[in-house]
């Protein structure tokens, strides 16, 4: 009987016949999560959470531990692959109106926030020059909180500056948060299967469904294979493609890097933060760049669920995608003209998409005479 239940969950799950390749990224994200937990465990076995030994322990893993270099590269590049998949997954949700399944969407955005926190803590653990200074800049934003800011920052740091207690607690958080991600992922999948996934046409798929296995499982395997191949090729031939050159030097609190920046997958939010010449305003914009995703289900006014047949929304969606890429690029540049203006314009366009959604939905209803 238990075998039958497992089959029902993963094999006989009824899925719409017309879901496209864009629906494959959920299974790819699960694979990334499994890989990160596995490689992370083997790295944690050899890692030392001490400011004097952390950098040396990373070098030791790369040089002395059998296949340690592979574990480290897979973990670092796997994180980038994780974020590429999750950003595409969210973009698909925005384009095809998956956010109207409110509970699934809310759990997914909570999952994104937890993932971003986990990745941030992990970036600090290498104790390279950029890790230290990126952590200093980002955690220092807590001081912008009125009244409580300084106390919160001191509490997070475990002292009056980033030091040994900070590294220890960041390691503890980086170790424990993946289990929260696993729990949230389970909740996300349960909520998704409660209502069923959307499809490219946005129609009710109940009249035309097929079992998940073997039809969609085989389709998922193709992209999964390509992703794992890409991961191993990059890890073997271009292992430092996503690394910052400053991070190959041990952290030195007395020397400030010329240009402080976090990992590439946070650059869009960091670019929005930098575009506002005010600490509190920038911190709020940074938080809102993610939190604004929570309001999307409540601002949908269009009668049609996906953007497949909504040209105005399509235009705004692809503007959002190009804006996201442009902010990411601008955030890698120094804070000087013309990059300041580019960041400010693209940040405004980023928020414009979310604010214009209800107006565009209403306009498209009028254009198509849908009351």
Swiss-Prot record:
Family as reported in the entry's similarity comment: Belongs to the cytochrome b family.
Function: Component of the ubiquinol-cytochrome c reductase complex (complex III or cytochrome b-c1 complex) that is part of the mitochondrial respiratory chain. The b-c1 complex mediates electron transfer from ubiquinol to cytochrome c. Contributes to the generation of a proton gradient across the mitochondrial membrane that is then used for ATP synthesis.
Organism of this sequence: Aspidites melanocephalus
Note: Heme 1 (or BL or b562) is low-potential and absorbs at about 562 nm, and heme 2 (or BH or b566) is high-potential and absorbs at about 566 nm.
Gene: MT-CYB
Protein's name according to its UniProt entry: Cytochrome b
Bilayer-spanning residue ranges: 25-45, 69-90, 105-125, 170-190, 218-238, 280-300, 312-332, 339-358
Keywords in alphabetical order: Electron transport, Heme, Iron, Membrane, Metal-binding, Mitochondrion, Mitochondrion inner membrane, Respiratory chain, Transmembrane, Transmembrane helix, Transport, Ubiquinone
List of residues binding heme b b562: 75, 174
UniProt membrane topology term: Multi-pass membrane protein
């Amino acid at each position: 009987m238990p075998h039958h239940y497992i089959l029902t969950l993963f094999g006989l799950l009824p899925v719409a016949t017309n879901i496209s390749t864009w629906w494959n990224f959920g299974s790819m994200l699960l694979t990334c999560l499994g890989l990160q937990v596995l490689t992370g465990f083997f790295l944690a076995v050899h890692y030392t959470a001490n400011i004097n030994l952390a950098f040396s322990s990373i070098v030791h893993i790369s040089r002395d531990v059998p296949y340690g270099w592979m574990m480290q590269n897979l973990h670092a590049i796997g994180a980038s692959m994780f974020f590429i998949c999750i950003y595409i997954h969210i973009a698909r949700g925005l384009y095809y109106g998956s956010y109207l399944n409110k509970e699934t969407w809310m759990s997914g955005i909570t999952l994104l926030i937890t993932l971003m926190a986990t990745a941030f803590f992990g970036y600090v653990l290498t104790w390279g020059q950029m890790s230290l200074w990126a952590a200093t800049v980002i955690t220092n934003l807590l001081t912008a909180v009125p009244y409580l800011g300084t106390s919160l920052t001191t509490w997070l740091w475990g002292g009056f500056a980033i030091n040994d207690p900070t590294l220890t607690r960041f390691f503890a958080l980086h170790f424990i948060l993946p289990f929260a991600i696993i729990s949230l992922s389970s909740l996300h999948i349960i909520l998704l299967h409660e209502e069923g996934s959307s499809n490219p046409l946005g129609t009710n798929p109940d009249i035309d469904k097929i079992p998940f296995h073997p039809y969609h499982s085989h389709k998922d395997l193709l992209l999964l294979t390509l992703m794992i191949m890409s991961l191993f090729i990059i890890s073997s031939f271009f292992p430092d493609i996503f690394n910052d050159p400053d991070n190959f030097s041990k952290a030195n609190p007395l020397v400030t890097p010329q240009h402080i920046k976090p990992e590439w997958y946070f650059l869009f939010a960091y670019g929005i933060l930098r575009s506002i010449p005010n600490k509190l305003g920038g911190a709020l914009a940074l938080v809102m760049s993610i939190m604004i995703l929570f309001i999307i289900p409540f601002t949908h006014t269009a009668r049609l669920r996906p953007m497949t047949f909504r040209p105005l929304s399509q235009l705004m969606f692809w503007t959002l995608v190009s804006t996201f890429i442009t902010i990411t690029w601008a955030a890698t540049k120094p804070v000087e003209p013309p990059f300041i203006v580019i960041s400010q314009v693209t940040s405004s366009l980023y928020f414009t998409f979310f604010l214009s959604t209800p107006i565009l939905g209403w306009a498209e209803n009028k254009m198509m005479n849908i009351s």
